[in-house]
Amino acid sequence: PKDKAMTLLERVIRNHRCRSTHHFIAFDALSLISGDEGEAWKSLFLVHHEHLLKGAKAPDAEFKDFKNHVLHVSEGEWGGARGKAQEWYARGVELLSKKRWSEAAYAFGVLSHYYADPIQPFHTGQTEAEGVIHRAVEWSIAKSRAETDARIETSGYPEIDVPDGMGFVSDMVREGAERSHAHYDTFIDHYDFDAGVANPPAGLDETMQAAIADLVAYATAGFAAILSRGIEEAAVAPPKVNLTLQGYFETLDIPLRWITAKLEDAADKRTVERMYAEFQKTGKVIKTLPADDKKIRALHAKEVRRIPLKQLDAEEIAPIGTLNENRLAAEPLELTQQAEDIVDDIPPAELAEISRRDSTKSGIRGLFGTRKRSAPEPEEAEVAADAEEASSAEILFDAEEEPAETVQPAKAPKVEEDGSPRRLASITRDDPVVDAPSIGRKTAK
């Protein structure tokens, strides 16, 4: 990839629209599109960035196909990420060849999600220790975007070799999963849950920050390489478009976006605090696991380990964060009463399953080797629902009058998919991730 600085328009769009790691990967890849017409293709996708970014979150927000978000490289490649990425690549190329620009942008956005998810180490394996901190780690990653940007600006993006053959996208998903899986145990050993629940970036030490920047840069460059190959395969020329800052400003909905980001921040904070409270009280996280994590945990227990959930619930977990380089003798976070109460605040639908668990309390190894009892007695209640992501389709820029073909963003296609979601990181907290500084494009030497 070439060294490219973002234009003012690109920086405005990036800061206004991107709210998750998936968004940043898909958007930043546009500046790395190769070929003589790379800039023209970037401009086209900028016109349709709403569809690209909507697609980048669709597997989490719409499809909810949990198993397709993972690839367990040490467990017979359990998971469906390879097939889904290949499927959406083919769909994106077909739409490009038909000049259905907005639909193609959506399809490639979806592809970016299935490609990037296995480049998050916790999407390449499954352990009880990981389950405790999975959501917290992703929250910390999202809230550390400024640090990640700065590191990538310094080190640059890697050169990606695109394999030969019809299944090259599938092969690239596997290569990314293998690269990230090397950090699986590292993330468990180095994440400071105590620090991260109070201040998300503080949960990451130097080892984790370096690994995160490397993986995010790799995922971004990898998706750009796939997108470049898809453009080449579609064998069509990009239409000319007129990108103006004024045209973009006319579409701004800053108050709505700001409110949505704040709601998402509050929901993510509440989720992580509840998980932390359960861990402090029981030594595990079972009842407060997000729905996607629960589904993957249950499927993995059934299809890979072939054990009942009751047996899995009783297992001890490995110590967490024992190698964190920033650990200080600090007092644990004092949680609010609301967070403490949530451990006993279980939806009625889950009580039947919980009641079947072994009532015998056994010693379980908690954070850094402390011993904790296995579970509290549940009471029937409803857990507050997380805020749903608000989305709106917008027509942003006018096409130039020169070309015969006009560019008019259309609604992203509705695609029916089975399953439920898995996540890389659509998480924010008190200040939106969009405050991350813009960066130029640099290539690792």
What kind of region is each of these model predictions?
Residues 104, 386-387:
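Homeobox/homeodomain signature
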Residues 235-240:
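N-terminal, non-catalytic alpha-helical interaction modules of very large eukaryotic scaffold proteins
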Residues 113:
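Divalent metal-coordination and catalytic microenvironments
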Residues 2-99, 103-106, 124-204, 209-217, ...:
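N-terminal, motif-rich segments that launch catalysis or mediate targeting to/interaction with membranes
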Residues 110, 217, 221-224:
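Generic structural signal for well-ordered, non-transmembrane alpha-helical segments
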Residues 336, 341-372, 376-379, 387-445:
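Intrinsically disordered, compositionally biased tail regions
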